[in-house]
Design a protein with these regions (language model features):
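Hydrophobic/aromatic residues within well-ordered alpha-helical segments
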Residues: 52, 59, 63, 67, ...
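Short coil/turn segments at alpha/beta junctions that flank glycine-rich nucleotide-binding fingerprints
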Residues: 23-27, 78, 99, 143
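Amphipathic alpha-helical packing segments from all-alpha helical-bundle domains
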Residues: 65-68, 106, 116-142, 153-157, ...
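Conserved hydrophobic residue
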Residues: 27, 146-147, 176
Length: 195
């Protein structure tokens, strides 16, 4: 098959699989579906990835790469903790809203259990991000001298849950536009977390 030699890279396979997983769901998408969408033979697909689980792992890993690059690395250099947190909310929300980064949606939506060694690696990266957010919230609480009613951990889970659920209902042509959503979510979070 001529297409076998034209396939750009593993990234093209991952982008296509992410699109299919997003549209159909992980369980409803077969390796045949992915191969067909790429105009590859099944053998050509297996040359790059041994299993659908391996594809899902790489999609989730790429989603974490995107989060680290576009959120964590983007805010690390901001010295003021409150401004750093405001920017984190903005950047994380923009990542979730980005249609280009289907990997994020797949990671947020798919609860299919990966094989334990792969799941452990993804979970470790997710925990690192949660701790980063939690520590930043604690730092803002110290600077603002809040009364400590809201724990940084509970606030981190609330913030991430609030932002990560957006992909379920947000429509670019809807009543809430991205910038307005960023402002409102930031206001809601700051009003509740820093009493």
């Amino acid at each position: 098959m001529i297409r076998e030699t034209l396939i750009d890279s593993r990234q093209e396979i991952l982008r296509t699989a992410a699109r299919l997983f997003q549209q159909r769901g992980y369980d409803a998408t077969s390796m045949n579906d992915v191969a067909s969408a790429l105009k590859l033979s099944k053998g050509g697909l297996y040359h790059h990835f041994q299993s659908k689980d391996e594809i899902l792992f790489h999609i989730m890993s790429h989603a974490m790469d995107i989060t680290e690059e576009k959120v964590v690395n983007a805010v690390r250099g901001i010295s003021d903790p409150e401004e750093r947190l405001r920017m984190l909310i903005r950047r994380h929300l923009n990542v979730v809203l980005s249609v280009r980064d289907r990997e994020i949606t797949v990671m947020l939506h798919e609860n299919h259990p990966l094989p334990p060694p792969l799941q452990k690696r993804i979970n470790a990266r997710k925990k690192d991000y949660i701790h980063f957010v939690e520590n930043l919230i604690a730092e803002v609480q110290r600077v603002k001298r809040t009364n400590g009613v809201v724990s940084p951990r509970a606030a981190a889970f609330a913030l991430l849950g609030m932002i990560n659920w957006i992909y379920q209902w947000y429509r670019p042509d809807g009543a809430l536009l991205g910038e307005d959503l960023v402002r409102q979510y930031t206001d809601i979070f700051f009003a509740g977390a820093f009493q």
